[in-house]
């Protein structure tokens, strides 16, 4: 999947603190075409992108209670495209009535020596998977509908097998901190996808 769009807002005193507003759900294989048809009608007037990404999750264990996590991913369908390094912060506690999960998000393009660099820094790969699916856009929002594949032999993404009989659905938007009105937009769009898919706030710690 592509990195979040570059913001045109001025930067003062360093980089902009970007936040991801996220809702997630799943849909059975037999419901995929109906959902894709609905998304084509609701999203921007352009053909949806397809993607096939190989993602590895790296951990750095220290004195803190939980390890520091970074994600390295590379596109399998675009040879020569850059790798991406992604950091996803812990969900903000904040107001329980907030319509989406909100977390800090950093996504940068890197060279193909990223895995070696992370290992030299002391990170160890925890797990890896392949994600294949479709990407739709609606303004600042994007909808990823994808199937997760289990990598049977480390590094051999080509032989990956489907993990389940369903597709994950992620509706997200990335924006500078403080723009909580985006959460309302994300929730409003999610309502338009019912009853095909139920998108909710899912705490990653509860599914690990």
Curated annotation (Swiss-Prot):
InterPro entries: Mediator_Med18. GO terms for molecular function: transcription coregulator activity. Keywords: Activator, Nucleus, Transcription, Transcription regulation. Its main location: nucleus. Transmembrane segments: none annotated. One of its GO terms (biological process) is positive regulation of transcription initiation by RNA polymerase II. It is found in: Nucleus. One of its GO terms (cellular component) is core mediator complex. Pfam families: Med18. Belongs to the Mediator complex subunit 18 family. Component of the Mediator complex, a coactivator involved in the regulated transcription of nearly all RNA polymerase II-dependent genes. Mediator functions as a bridge to convey information from gene-specific regulatory proteins to the basal RNA polymerase II transcription machinery. Mediator is recruited to promoters by direct interactions with regulatory proteins and serves as a scaffold for the assembly of a functional preinitiation complex with RNA polymerase II and the general transcription factors. PANTHER family: MEDIATOR OF RNA POLYMERASE II TRANSCRIPTION SUBUNIT 18, MEDIATOR OF RNA POLYMERASE II TRANSCRIPTION, SUBUNIT 18. Component of the Mediator complex. This is Mediator of RNA polymerase II transcription subunit 18. The lineage of its organism: Eukaryota, Metazoa, Chordata, Craniata, Vertebrata.
């Amino acid at each position: 999947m592509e990195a979040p769009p570059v913001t045109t807002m001025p930067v003062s005193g360093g980089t902009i603190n970007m936040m991801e507003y996220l809702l997630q759900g799943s849909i059975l294989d037999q419901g995929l075409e109906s959902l894709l048809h609905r998304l084509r009608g609701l999203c921007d007037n352009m053909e949806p992108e397809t993607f096939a990404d190989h993602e590895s999750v790296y951990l750095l264990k220290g004195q803190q209670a939980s390890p520091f996590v970074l994600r390295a991913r590379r596109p399998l369908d675009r040879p020569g495209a850059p790798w991406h390094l992604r950091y996803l912060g812990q969900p903000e506690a904040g107001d329980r009535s907030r319509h989406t999960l909100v977390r800090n998000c950093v996504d940068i393009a890197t060279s193909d020596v990223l895995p070696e660099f992370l290992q030299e820094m002391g990170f160890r790969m925890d797990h890896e998977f392949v994600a294949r699916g479709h990407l739709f856009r609606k303004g600042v929002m994007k909808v990823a509908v994808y199937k997760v594949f289990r990598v049977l032999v480390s590094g051999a993404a080509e032989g990956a097998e489907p993990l389940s009989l369903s597709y994950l659905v992620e509706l997200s938007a990335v924006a500078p901190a403080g723009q909580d009105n985006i959460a309302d937009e994300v929730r409003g769009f999610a309502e338009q996808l019912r009853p095909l898919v139920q998108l909710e706030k899912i705490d990653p710690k509860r599914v690990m």
